[in-house]
């Protein structure tokens, strides 16, 4: 009884339930069925786009979102999905245009403002622009917390406040906004007696990234006597991902899982020791870890710019240069320093040999967000040519930030298309100039491995002291 209309209503209701509970594969199947049954339903195309994006299918998400917009141009949420899909497809300027188009129609749209600010910090290298954009949202209860977090993260790159003031603000933010409600998880049972402890890694960066180059040697050692359980929060898959997979006893893809569900998933995995390798690159995972879903938890490489502000970690893994004992007041986590250095650099097989004769032009090879006002002002006083190397310098607005501060006369930009190409460019030069306040971590180690010299600076935060071990060496 009821016929096709009732049947359609039933599976559509089930699809919405799956969507609300972030059961993405089931929701995807339901809305795909809905789109087939009701091809003129903008809402179904939009919800299908949401699922496709969550499942790491950005091109399909873009197409579905644009179909929804064609059917209902006023459906601004589909413009957001379109922009986020374009970002995932490596088309940030098109993504920015999508968000800007939405803001032309709705100037106070908080989601679009935050999305543009994210691109400003993480792609175009203009954190101060991001701060100016989100400041009005501090008065908007629906978006104030996200705006505050954006300002805090931008301040890591360029700020007027002290390290202590920023760390205190981060701790206050985490206490207010990053802690899941108490009682979400039952008390953890005592650790079981077993020959191989269960060691969990959680990160969106199980790929060609500092997480691979600075931690894989450690995990290869740990895997000899422990079962490695990976909670993968990222969609990028490459040769480094395969290296992590080769060590994993269990591999869980939990990319779009909300914080409470993620905390429960980790809890159910019966983890003895968990290492967070995402940090502020993944605030949702940090929120999940606020519930202490593993018996012991440590913060290590990956978004390890400054304290998480959480009191559930058993330690912050650092070393005497980056997190000296005297800096404990900057951390909510107990500092656990590794003698001789907190990480071991594993070079890729394509690391070029150091040439005998190196070029004198100094190189600035850094995420453009690290090019602070103070650093660029210092650089402007340095005579002679400078070479800026990063794929993000392909964007005019990113280059313009440098040219306005340093001048165009002695500036050259190179935009390598791969990590391998970047290393080949870097290794031809004698000097790498480190940035401040946010310093080079992996890049400085790569430079030294290729026989380069590094001009370093010293700050107080963890991310401001990455290169100090080079001075000691």
PLM region descriptions:
Residues 18, 205-206, 366-370, 393:
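Short donor-sugar binding/catalytic loops of nucleotide-sugar-dependent glycosyltransferases
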Residues 202, 364-367, 390, 414:
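Short hydrophobic "strand-cap" motifs at the C-terminus of beta-strands
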């Amino acid at each position: 009884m009821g016929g096709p209309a009732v049947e359609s209503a039933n599976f559509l209701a089930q699809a919405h339930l799956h969507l609300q509970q972030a059961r993405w594969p089931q929701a995807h199947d339901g809305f795909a069925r809905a789109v087939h049954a009701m091809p003129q339903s903008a809402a179904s195309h939009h919800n299908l786009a949401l699922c496709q994006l969550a499942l790491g299918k950005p091109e399909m998400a873009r197409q579905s979102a644009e179909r929804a917009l064609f059917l209902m141009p006023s459906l601004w949420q589909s413009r957001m999905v379109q922009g986020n899909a374009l970002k995932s497809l490596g088309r940030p300027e098109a993504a920015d245009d999508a968000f800007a188009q939405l803001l032309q129609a709705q100037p106070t749209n908080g989601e679009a403002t935050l999305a543009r600010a994210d691109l400003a910090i993480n792609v175009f290298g203009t954190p101060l622009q991001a701060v100016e954009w989100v400041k009005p949202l501090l008065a908007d209860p629906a978006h104030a917390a996200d705006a505050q977090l954006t300002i805090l993260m931008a301040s890591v790159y360029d700020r007027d406040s002290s390290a202590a003031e920023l760390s205190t603000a981060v701790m206050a933010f985490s206490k207010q906004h990053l802690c899941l409600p108490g009682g979400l998880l039952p008390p953890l049972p005592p650790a079981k007696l077993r020959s191989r402890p269960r060691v969990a890694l959680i990160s969106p960066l199980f790929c060609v990234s500092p997480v691979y180059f600075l931690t894989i040697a450690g995990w290869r050692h740990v895997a000899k006597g422990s079962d490695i359980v990976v909670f993968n929060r990222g969609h990028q898959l490459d040769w480094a991902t395969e290296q992590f997979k080769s060590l994993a006893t269990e591999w869980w893809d939990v990319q779009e899982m909300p914080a409470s569900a993620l905390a429960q998933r980790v809890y159910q995995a019966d983890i003895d020791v968990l290492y967070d390798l995402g940090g502020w690159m993944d605030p949702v995972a940090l929120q999940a870890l606020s519930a202490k879903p593993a018996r012991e938890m440590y913060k290590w490489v990956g978004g390890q710019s400054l304290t998480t502000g959480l009191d559930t970690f058993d330690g912050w893994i650092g070393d005497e240069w980056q997190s000296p004992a005297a800096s404990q007041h900057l951390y909510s986590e107990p500092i656990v320093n590794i003698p001789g250095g907190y990480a071991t650099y594993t070079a890729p097989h394509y690391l070029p040999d150091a040439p005998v004769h190196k070029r004198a032009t100094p190189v600035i090879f850094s995420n453009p967000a690290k090019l602070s006002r103070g650093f660029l002002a210092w650089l402007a006083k340095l005579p002679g040519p400078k070479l800026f190397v990063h794929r993000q310098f392909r964007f005019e607005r990113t280059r313009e930030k440098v040219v306005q501060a340093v001048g165009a006369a002695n500036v050259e930009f190179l935009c390598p298309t791969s990590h391998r190409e970047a290393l080949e460019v870097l290794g031809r030069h004698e000097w790498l100039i480190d940035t401040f306040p946010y310093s080079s971590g992996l890049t400085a180690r790569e430079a030294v491995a290729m026989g380069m010299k590094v001009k370093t600076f010293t700050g107080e935060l963890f991310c401001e002291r990455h290169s100090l071990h080079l001075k000691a060496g």
